[in-house]
């Protein structure tokens, strides 16, 4: 199946679930070609949200990455600028969670950068739900359910880039059959 636009499938890791209080600590994305859904490019950055070593240490433990990785990470403003520079705002955004979109919008707002993506977002959860209904799967279509169904191995459930790549594979399998 061919699409009108390239698809930018993104995933995030956050300090918690509350958009107004918590922060993105990893932003990752894979750009899928509109013609064949193969990965054209990718983006991955951890985000330093605190200068306190104990807070950074907690985030590093949560993400299962070395403390030094987060300590040396760029701030949110720099990450969002790099994200825009890499992909622009023309691809169609895709993600597995509406809250991911809300967190991304909030990140743009916090950095005073314009959020210029199309208001239409490809919702992988809904696509997965329809797929599971069609094939009679009895589980809710979480990403883990779909990873298991398609025999995809996830090594770190808190790695946004790994989740983005596995989500892209799920998307390809659902769309291409």
Positions of predicted regions on the chain:
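Short, glycine/charged-enriched secondary-structure capping and boundary segments
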Residues: 22-25, 106-110
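Short alpha-helix plus adjacent loop in nuclease-associated cores
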Residues: 121-137
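Short conserved catalytic/interaction loops centered on acidic-Pro-aromatic/His motifs
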Residues: 115-117, 137-140
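Generic detector of well-ordered alpha-helical packing
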Residues: 12-14, 124, 164
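Acidic, Mg2+-coordinating catalytic module of metal-dependent nucleases/exonucleases
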Residues: 91-98, 103-108, 141-177
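Conserved non-catalytic scaffold segment of RNase H-like nuclease domains
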Residues: 2-8, 13-101, 148, 158
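A short alpha->loop->secondary-structure connector
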Residues: 108-119
